[in-house]
Amino acid sequence: MSSASNLARIALSFGLPAGLLDRGPALRGTKFLARAALKARFGGRPFQMVNVGACDGALFDDVTPWLHRIARARAMLVEPIPYNQKRLRANYPDTGRFIIEPVAVTRTRGTITVHTFDAAALEDGTLPIEFIGCSSVTDSNLMSGKNAWGEADANFNKFAPHLKDIEVPSETLQTLLDRNGVAHIDAFLVDCEGADWMVFDQLDLKRYRPGMIK
């Protein structure tokens, strides 16, 4: 996206009326990010994002792409699925500012089984591309053949053959933050398909006090 387009988006974000913002947390988040983008143009401490379960940092994600709009922004992007890691690095190629941790966040260091989908089936269109964001360490409805209401999913047999379990390394959240020298957090994002609390529960809110949590 061009610099002019980014400036236009930031300006429009600041133009959102307070009454509208109060009706939508997502819009308040947009204004927070726009303010960060404006502040970054005048120097100061670099904006720091931590995203656990980053997927590819683009698909169905309205927050992580702001890293490209906020000058000098930095991020620790945690993503355990190899297929997603490749897409994530392609979308955020600056290795100096955007650190990818190829692990899952757990309460103890080790390895963990992740339920996921075959990368080839995603790549050739056999499976919907949105399935790249559905990997989980829990037995989510999708992985168990149930729909959003917990009832048997009639379409489960179409994608069940492409389900697989993989072993990935796991680490505690604080270890990752310390390893990457994360001293402050402006935006903290978690999307772990049913295991979100395992991550949130480890964040020291008094220490980091993120301005945005999603």
Predicted regions and their residues:
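Phosphate/nucleotide-binding beta-alpha loop and adjacent structural elements of enzyme active sites
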Residues: S2-K214
